[in-house]
From Swiss-Prot:
Record remark: domains: Contains 2 putative kinase domains (111-243 and 258-391 AA), the first one is involved in autophosphorylation and the other may be inactive.
GO molecular function: 3'-5' exonuclease activity; ATP binding; metal ion binding; nucleoside diphosphate kinase activity; protein kinase activity
Deletion phenotype: Nme7-deficient mice show situs inversus, hydrocephalus and excessive nasal exudates, phenotypes suggestive of primary ciliary dyskinesia.
Pfam families named among the record's database cross-references: NDK, PH_NDK7_N
Subcellular location: Cytoplasm, Cytoskeleton, Microtubule organizing center, Centrosome; Nucleus; Cytoplasm; Cytoplasm, Cytoskeleton, Spindle
PROSITE patterns on file: DM10, NDPK_LIKE
Name of the featured protein: Nucleoside diphosphate kinase homolog 7
Amino acid sequence: MRACQQGRSSSLVSPYMAPKNQSERFAFIAEWYDPNASLLRRYELLFYPTDGSVEMHDVKNRRTFLKRTKYEDLRLEDLFIGNKVNVFSRQLVLIDYGDQYTARQLGSRKEKTLALIKPDAVSKAGEIIEMINKSGFTITKLRMMTLTRKEAADFHVDHHSRPFYNELIQFITSGPVIAMEILRDDAICEWKRLLGPANSGLSRTDAPGSIRALFGTDGVRNAAHGPDTFASAAREMELFFPSSGGCGPANTAKFTNCTCCIIKPHAISEGMLGKILIAIRDACFGMSAIQMFNLDRANVEEFYEVYKGVVSEYNDMVTELCSGPCVAIEIQQSNPTKTFREFCGPADPEIARHLRPETLRAIFGKTKVQNAVHCTDLPEDGLLEVQYFFKILDN
């Protein structure tokens, strides 16, 4: 598989080889959809980790599109095949490595695996995600869902002859689970190491800092799951995140007494997702549906349409929300829109830090655009915004 990837990359090796100054740089082939011409345009994207600068070349016309320019919003961790990155308001999809050096350095050991938080540990999702981020994983997909008995049987097919099979099925269907696709070098092995032994009691002895030691109870109620092999990882990820474009198991949105929260891309890329989920839970808000989305600009413009011509930061808000993955949450609470908006605090984090220092934006926000979270402003829009993500976009 890896040899095939490197071979495929060689056909797209750029004519722009390593720069004369010999500074390290990584090359990718990226595509951008030009809405005006209705065309997919292909570029070579160069990233220089020494100073965080980027350079772009038009592949078809063989000319420089963007001279080498420092760009602080792109990190080396963002650069992997299939990811969407935002470079000066253009959303680029990374489709291949641009040269064999980049393929060898960044692609040789990258793996994806399934991380599944089981029903007994969903309330500790923030802590588990925090451990995942600190262990060098990138979360590329995330979805809270419920499993039918048929889906549970497909998931546990390898345990069908085990005496505890029925207990497994009953437990995994007893409440919501959170499925994630996670990425890093040697992901399968490293995720199993972070999980600890399958029996939580043994984990507390042999791996006291592991997820199962901290959050599990026994061999079935053991907080989280990870596949053992490449084959099982591929099979299980196909169950939860079908490559055919289907939704997989049903999401958990209730569409009652709800409002919408969106954790913005900058907060995700800065590793704040787990901390924000913990803060929301500790403030006694119910999180009845959670899902990661990669939005295109048209989706964001539609979602933010009410702010167009009203908020001076509208264009920057749109650019931020489509700059990378975001996480949408259905918040449930009595009078949810008002109480959650107050918990988020003023839109400007500087004002929030002076007036409401305990709010989400005061703690996690940076600027009025990169203010960590979006929340519904008007009570009549709470359900509509939740439906936009968990009914329209999810389907």
